[in-house]
Amino acid sequence: MRHRNTGRYLGRNSSHRDSMLKNMIISLIRYEIIHTTLQKAKELRKILEPLITISKINSISNRRNIYSKIRNNEIIHKLFNDIGPRFLKKNGGYLSILKSGYRKGDNAYMAYIKFTNTKKNI
């Protein structure tokens, strides 16, 4: 029985899944919008929104906490100096998922995931 087991497997083993989600976090912070499958976007939102909440307070301990999850100084700098301050007055709901139809090759449902107040368009 799988009672109280949360999260999606996404057709991968745990190390591959963690690595893929970490790379997607880095891409989303760098480009502020990415195109992926709907299930990956929902899983990414669940992981990234708490990191944005932590990044609203710029302290050494918060930087080290996020560095333990992301391991990329350029992305951490952008998260704390650009993205975190944008959401100071907002409590949650930092990301939006926009559905974009089915992928032609395998009919997977696709979506755009982006920051709610980004200036970049689809």
Curated annotation (Swiss-Prot):
SUPFAM superfamilies: Prokaryotic ribosomal protein L17
Gene3D superfamilies membership: Ribosomal protein L17
GO CC field: cytosolic large ribosomal subunit
Gene Ontology molecular function: structural constituent of ribosome
UniProt keywords, alphabetically: Ribonucleoprotein, Ribosomal protein
Biological process (GO), any one: translation
InterPro entries: Ribosomal_bL17, Ribosomal_bL17_CS, Ribosomal_bL17_sf
Family to which this protein belongs: Belongs to the bacterial ribosomal protein bL17 family.
Quaternary assembly: Part of the 50S ribosomal subunit. Contacts protein L32.
Protein's recorded name: Large ribosomal subunit protein bL17
Source organism of the structure: Wigglesworthia glossinidia brevipalpis
The organism's taxonomic lineage, starting at the top: Bacteria, Pseudomonadati, Pseudomonadota, Gammaproteobacteria, Enterobacterales
Gene behind this protein: rplQ
